[in-house]
Structure formats: structure tokens, C-alpha cells
Amino acid sequence: MVILYAILAIIVILAAVLLINAAITSAKARKLEGNHPTFTDEELKTYAETFSRMLQCATVSVKDTHDDTEFAKLRAVVEEAFPLLHQKAQRQLLAEDCWMYKIPGKDTSRNILLMSHHDVVPAETEGWDYEPFSGAIVDGKVYGRGAADTKGSLCAILFAAEEMLRAGITPPVNLYIVSSHNEELGGDGMAATLEYCQKNGITFEVILDEGGAIVEPPLAGMNCEMCSMVAVHEKGRLKLKCTVKNESSHVSLTAFKGNPVERMSQFIQEITTKNIFIRRLHPETRGLFTGLAPYCKLPMKLLLSNLWLFGGLLTKVLPKLNATAGGMGGTTCNFQTIEGSVNSKECTASVMLRNVNEEDLKADVAAFKAVAEEYGITLETERDEYYAPADMASPAYAYPMDCLAKVFPRFPAAPYILPAGTDAWRLTPVCNCVLRFAPTRMSKQQLGSIHAENENLDISAIAEAAAFYKYLVRNYK
């Protein structure tokens, strides 16, 4: 009986601790109240018309070539719409059409960078309610390829700079604005930017690029309308070529069974069904959960407020929710191609490993290699890129998060790991705090329209994003 009472006491104490932690989490959290930026009809009309003109420029980037026709058209639109920026900022083109503006600040020894890209992916007319490059303005929205990815944030950045110059505001530090012309291809625009910065000794305290946005709550049952999701890390890429060959006749007693295609298939089956990679609750994911916990309902609030107890469970459960959630826990593996036939003497496959942590990746590759050796498969590295995470302990990270609380007080903000790819990784050698975040508000439909039909943004979302950029720059310390 004593044991039973002891067990019950432990359960009661544990439940009390969990509930107290949840209550403390809520008590310490920022209250979601306050006013968001508002705009006159005339201001919104100006934003809409300029944004529409930018979307009418079909700046589709094409591999291995650059036709400047539509890009030149966009440059002309931007020069006309933002005259003060082009009069007062230092401007140059890198590569064929990567824009770089510099607005000197009061402290010319320090730099911040707002970046975007103005190239877009192709768009077919089929499936669109309006022509993809019409820039149609309908019901408070502007439609067109590139609206969300990422001419919207670029338009907001340019408006912010123009409006500050019109008001006679000098940024506290040097403000750089960079927009690439071939981000969608993984082109040389940002590579040229990095080369220029390194050659001229330019480093940045903080960089803001695309990636995260202001979106509908990522977790069910949250007590908020939208969330500011700030990507502080981008998963690295390791591409391997896997090769298996038929052994020569003098090794016919080999332990390997089956022809190359069979062995490769068995290898892929084992890799994709076994959990051979390290999984953990990374700091970025921990920050995501703790940032959103106060605004969740029970029982989710209880789980996220007590990661000391439930962290391991969440790490195991996340892959079962969806691929994006699962990818936050560690290395993911995606076989992309396989070549060979039953009668061929060899079979090859390419695989992409996306990793969160560089040290974990070393162990993951060793585990991957061990399985490959069981099937006589050799590995060759074709691509190896690791992207350093932003320093979440730095003032450079804390400041934009504080700006989000000031400009969008009704939306919680939290960090996360970006599963997609951006140009921002190229600039990690010149900045310890690269944030993949554009302050554009998007519904699920708008987020899903990226690289798809009916891409659009609200006019007010562009104006709000410009207000955020202005606040961030003019109050920078």
C-alpha cells in the first residue's frame, strides 16, 4: 500500500510540475495585443500599382543563358518608381543583373543587408484565373508570377528605402540591398555578391532574406491568427553517387548476392526503412517549440512547456506528422535517380542527404557507408554544402525578433529550420546571423501558390512589410 501511495504522490507531483511550467510559460510570454500598421487608400493604391508593374516583367531565369530584355524592363520600372533610391544610393550590378545598393549610414563601419531575388520560375497560363504576368489587381490582392517568391518582399524593401530617404532619414548603419537575378537556378548572383564583399572586407551584423514569412499557425489549436516564422538555419546538402558493380569471375564466391540492380534496390530499401540517422531536438527546433508554447491550447501547451520530459517523445513523433516536421530532427535521405538494368554490369544511384548538424552528419555518413558496404556499394561525393545556423544568442537575432513584436504585436514569433533552399547560405562567411525571413503575410493559399498557379499577395501585406523594414532599419542600434 505504501508503494501505491508513493506512486500516486509521484504522479500528482509530476502533474503539478507540468501544469506549473505551462502556467509560467504563459505568464512570461508576450501578450498578443496592440495595433498593426494601417494605411490610407492612396498609399495602398501606390503600393499596388508599383507592385503590379514589377510583376508584369517576365523575369524568368533560364539555365546557361541570360536574356536581359525583361530584366531591363524591370530595372526601368524600379528606377522610375524609386527615384530617390537611385539618386542617393550607391548602386552597381554584379554578374549580369544582381543588384546592389548601398545607403551610407551614420556609422559607416557597420553594415546590415536586406536581400531578395527578382528572377522567377516559368508560368503556364493554364490553371491561372488571371494571366501570370498581368499583375492583375483584384479584391485587394495582386496576382502574378513572383508575387510571393519574391518580388513582394523586394517591392517592400525598395519602398522602405525610398520612404526613409524621402523623410530625410539616414540609417544608423550602412544599409545594403541586394537582389539576385538567378536565385531560382542556384546561379552566380549571390556568389558574385560574396566575392565582392570578401574582396572589399564587408561583413554584416544581420542579413534578412526570403524563407520564413508571416503565416497561419503551424500547430493546431493555437490562440492567434498568424505567426511570424523566422528561419534561422537551412539544412545542408550532401549529394552522393552510389555505385555497385558485378564482381569478376575470380571472386565468384563473394558474399554479395544478386545482380547490381537487385543489390542497389535492397540497399535503398534498407536505408529508407531503417532509422540509421541521429535524431535530436536541435536548438532551433527547441526555440520553435518554446516560442509557440504560450499560445497553444492544452494538451499541446503542456507538451511544449515541458521539453525536459517530452523532448525525446516529440523527436520520435515528428517524422510521423509530415516530412517537414520530421526533417527538423536530423538528416533526411532522398534517393533522386537510379540507373541500370538486369543485364548491365553496374548500377548507380544518386542520393541527397539534408543535414541539420555538421557533426551529426559525419556519424550519419559513417552509418550510411556501413550499410552500403554490406552490398558492395561504393560512395562518391558530388556535392557537399553545410550552412551555418544564425547565432540565436546574439543581439543581431534578438533585435529583429523585437521588431516583429513591435510592428506585428498580435502575432507570436518563433525560429525554425528551413527545409527548402535560398541564396542566403552563400553569405554565411560574411555574417553570423543570416535570417531567412521576409515579413510578408501569407494565407495557406498564397503560400501554396509559390511556383504554382494564382500566385498572389495582399496589397496590405506589401505595405506592412515595408513598415517592418523601415522600423528595423531606422531603429537599428
Tell what function each PLM region has.
Residues 1-9:
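Feature marks short, highly hydrophobic, charge-poor N-terminal signal-anchor/signal peptide-like helices
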Residues 18, 159-166, 266-270, 471-474:
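Short glycine/serine- and small hydrophobic-enriched flexible loop segments
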Residues 142, 148-229:
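Acidic/histidine-rich catalytic neighborhood of metal-dependent amide-processing enzymes
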